[in-house]
Amino acid sequence: KKKLKKINTIDLCFIDGNHQEKSTIFYFNECLKYTNNNTIFIFDDIYWSKGMENAWQYIKSNKKTTLTIDLFYLGIVFIKSELSKENYKIRF
């Protein structure tokens, strides 16, 4: 949190490691404060557990989230206000 305060905006944010619903949502919400209209989030292990699936659903439904791509092992989120809200799922 302290390091985020030193950053004006986040262009790319990779979130990995904790695998807990509450923590993942917390990290997303904290980083969301520093986004711009071209920010991309990447979340690892979105199906690691039921909690991570819940966190992924929360992230997809956030009003600032405009486009998501579910690659099963990871999720990509675009924050771009002029895009239509879309959720894609690609398995490969």
Question: What residue spans do the PLM features occupy?
Answer:
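Structural motif
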Residues: 12-14, 42
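S-adenosyl-L-methionine
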Residues: 1-12, 22
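C-terminal substrate-binding/active-site "lid" region of AdoMet-derived donor-dependent transferases
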Residues: 22-92
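Switch II (G3) loop of P-loop NTPases
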Residues: 16-19
